[in-house]
Amino acid sequence: MKITSRELTDIFQKHVENLFPNKELKPVEITVATNENFGDYQCNFAMINSKIIGDNPRKIAEEVKNNFPYGDVIEKLEVAGPGFINIFLSDKYISNSIKKIGEDYDFSFLNRKGKVIIDFSSPNIAKRMHIGHLRSTIIGESISRIYRFLGYDVVADNHIGDWGTQFGKLIVGYRNWLDKKAYKKNAIEELERVYVKFSDEAEKDPSLEDLARAELKKVQDGEEENTKLWKEFITESLKEYNKLYKRLDVHFDTYYGESFYNDMMADVVKELVDKKIAVDDDGAKVVFFDEKDNLFPCIVQKKDGAYLYSTSDIATVKFRKNTYDVNRMIYLTDARQQDHFKQFFKITDMLGWNIEKYHIWFGIIRFADGILSTRKGNVIKLEELLDEAHSRAYDVVNEKNPNLSEGEKQNIAEVVGVSSVKYADLSQNKQSDIIFEWDKMLSFEGNTAPYLLYTYARIQSILRKVAELNIGLNENIEIKTENKIEKSLATYLLAFPISVLKAGETFKPNLIADYLYELSKKLNSFYNNCPILNQDIETLKSRALLIKKTGEVLKEGLELLGIPILNKM
């Protein structure tokens, strides 16, 4: 299915090139009209090309309009202000385009060469996921879905933290203070407990730190017993993580943890030294940057031979470069890691690895009492957050529809609760800090998941009533857009793929949320002003098909945010 703005762009581009030959014109730009009174789309061609053409922009716009080859797509053009061209789509084009909704959109104009690696979530083994993991996990999942929708070949990678000094401490804690019953019941929770226990005991007996280093060395050397324990910790942790990923509807193609790259880091450092990118500095291997880069030096190997996160991340890029036909890498982490990514991105550029790299950073989540801190022991676990959302959503569902079966209430509560948490995050600018307010998140009014889910369920309720009348909705129905409110809804449906495209280009899922909220408002205005069921048969069919296609767009948009739909609420 052609994207309306692209189709209009092609029509205008061909027209102005014929109208103004032998001119190096700036490309035509078509945007959705900001005010419905000024058409469906707008073009500023005359404004941006007046100097090139050598004439007044208003006069240029009039010339474009007066010589325009009208066809089935455009009904009329109007010139406004200093030279804007307002575009009004034909009713026939709108109707035919809406009936095509459900077909794949044509994004062939994008440069989709090579794979896109999206690196997100990345929890640390033997630690339960907490609220701080939410943003990377669900924003990364949404960006993965958006890129797949746009036709890119995506690899979603969970770069888990499965290596480091904590494993020596865990092994000491496991052997000295493990509660086997608790471990069997919830391994990762018990591992967290013994890790804290180790820290407490090590304050009293510092020799435990030496013991932990010795146990870690055994893991690093591949000693059988400790290696077996290390792998067990990973397996048990992933079991718990995958339960949460299933609940959040998050999916990964690969789980290459930090340990996977251990054997590659020596070669990375050697290459950096051989290319004189890294130099010896008091026994350590360090990369110094140009003053204009405004970056601190980056240590890639300490004087004791140990490697750092930067070394591991450079090795990761090298592996991906050599393994995949990779064109782009996208990383999702919080804002605190910005300097780290600037450093290692610059190093990979210095190595001549021509790959697009993006660090998508985000703010933190807050509640009324401020930032959640693990040091204070009050960090909210992700499972606890989702359980609380479920419980609160259940109370709302039970109050609004007490006649539902218990199974229906529980299912709706899970969808509404988890979706409310996800949408409260995804509907915000990712670089802003998020303040969770339960009443606001679970409200059926405003820009919330319950409002969008209810809008979709309402569509399905009306379509069920249409079906009970034995009225079929097929592609032969002409969708009428004579009514201003009908046309507003209909033309807005055609803007959906552009909102997805912009969300992908800017890594902002909130642009899709903004679109869906505006679409839902237009739909509810349509409900209130354009009756469906008690109308003549042609009007009924037209309006029923229009809301059916609206439901399809709403569903597709929610899926891009990782939010499932409900047919009943």
Swiss-Prot record:
GO molecular function term, any single one: arginine-tRNA ligase activity
Where, per UniProt, does this protein localize? Cytoplasm
Please give the InterPro entries that the UniProt record associates with this protein. Answer: aa-tRNA-synth_I_CS, Arg-tRNA-ligase, Arg-tRNA-synth_N, Arg-tRNA-synth_N_sf, ArgRS_core, DALR_anticod-bd, Rossmann-like_a/b/a_fold, tRNAsynth_Ia_anticodon-bd
Give the GO terms filed under biological process for this record.
arginyl-tRNA aminoacylation
Give GO cellular component annotations, separated by semicolons: cytoplasm
Q: Classify the source by domain of life.
A: Bacteria
The UniProt entry annotates the motif 'HIGH' region at 123-133
Which pairs of positions does the record mark as disulfide bonds? Answer: none
Q: Which reaction does it catalyse?
A: tRNA(Arg) + L-arginine + ATP = L-arginyl-tRNA(Arg) + AMP + diphosphate
Q: Which E.C. number(s) belong to this protein?
A: 6.1.1.19
Asked whether the keyword Cytoplasm is assigned, the reply is yes
Enzyme's top EC category: ligase
What's the subunit arrangement here? Monomer.
* PANTHER family, sorted: ARGININE--TRNA LIGASE, CYTOPLASMIC, ARGINYL-TRNA SYNTHETASE
Q: What family, per the record?
A: Belongs to the class-I aminoacyl-tRNA synthetase family.
Question: What is the protein name stated in its UniProt record?
Answer: Arginine--tRNA ligase
Q: From which organism does this entry originate?
A: Fusobacterium nucleatum subsp. nucleatum (strain ATCC 25586 / DSM 15643 / BCRC 10681 / CIP 101130 / JCM 8532 / KCTC 2640 / LMG 13131 / VPI 4355)
What gene name is listed for this protein? Answer: argS
